[in-house]
Regions:
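Short, non-transmembrane amphipathic alpha-helical segments
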Residues: 81-105
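Cleaved targeting-peptide boundary
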Residues: 17-31
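Solvent-exposed amphipathic alpha-helical surface segments
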Residues: 15, 41-45, 97-101
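Classical Sec-dependent N-terminal signal peptides that target proteins to the secretory pathway
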Residues: 1-20
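Polar/charged, Gly/Pro-rich intrinsically disordered segments
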Residues: 28, 37-66, 72-76, 104-135
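Short, intrinsically disordered, charge-biased short linear motifs at domain edges
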Residues: 20, 82-88, 116-123
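Polar/charged alpha-helical tracts
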Residues: 29, 33-36, 91
Length: 135
């Protein structure tokens, strides 16, 4: 999870420097380039453990303005995840990502994390973007 916060920090810094000069598509290009650079760096390490999870995928889709990460729990099956887990995960995801200017301003960019169980069944799909962050 720490790597993801580093990703968002890099993107925030890159876009804040570029925001003074960039307008519209230029800002998208700055964000895209920052995320693509981070993706290339992180892909070299995949898969790797993050606490109880293994990071198994990271994708940046500049046309859709989306950052997607996938992680798999190293012990839990689908039935092992409680409702409290899902509620807390959603709150934590939004709280962490809505602090980032890429997702809390109307840039059109979103971040999604797909959480899977040990058998790669989807447990939860978390998303943060301007719409969720402005509620």
């Amino acid at each position: 999870m720490k790597f993801f916060f580093n990703i968002l920090s890099i993107c925030a810094i890159s876009s804040s420097f570029g925001a003074f000069k960039a307008v519209g598509n230029e800002l998208d290009e700055v964000i895209c380039n920052a995320m693509k650079g981070m993706q290339a760096k992180e892909e070299k390490k995949i898969p790797y453990n993050i606490g109880d999870y293994e990071l198994i995928g990271i994708t940046v889709d500049c046309k859709k303005k989306a950052l997607i990460t996938e992680k798999k729990h190293i012990q839990y099956s689908l039935s092992d995840f409680s409702e409290d887990y899902k509620i807390n995960a959603i709150k934590n995801w939004e709280k962490a990502n809505c602090k980032n200017m890429i997702f809390n301003t109307n840039t059109g960019w979103s971040t999604t994390q797909i959480i899977q169980d040990t058998d790669k069944n989807v447990v939860l799909k978390l998303k943060a973007n301007f719409e969720t962050c402005s509620q």
